Amino acid sequence: MEDLAERRLQTVRDHMALEIVSDWDAVIATFEHPRYEMATGAVFDGEEAVRGYFAASRTPFPDQGNEIIAIAHDGDTVLVEFWLTGTHLGPLKLRGQTIEPTGRSFRVRMAASFEFPPGSDKIICERPFFDPGAVSRALGL
């Protein structure tokens, strides 16, 4: 495999590992321009918006993690299938309500695409794909 493809795969592996340890400065550094496009249609564009997304998603699940199942590179895209894990330890905003911590854990299967500009190993967009109700069901909510 070419060097650029290997560097892109490593960038994604590093990005995901840094998310587990909540090293947000280092996660941001994996981007050329931080941007998340969610399956729900929500877009977090720019460092401030992405940091806000990190804070909001980690408040209910401060131990949120991921376990890579498969990773592949094609063109300017890296695709990852992974387990998303976490424990409901903080308030969760769900359907206009705030759900107090249950202490329950979840493990749901997800996928994400990571887009790169031509010739670069810096991410320009992460697009996570998941069933929005999967975590709620796993938590019994």
Residue ranges with predicted function:
Residues 1-141:
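C-terminal and inter-domain tail/linker signature
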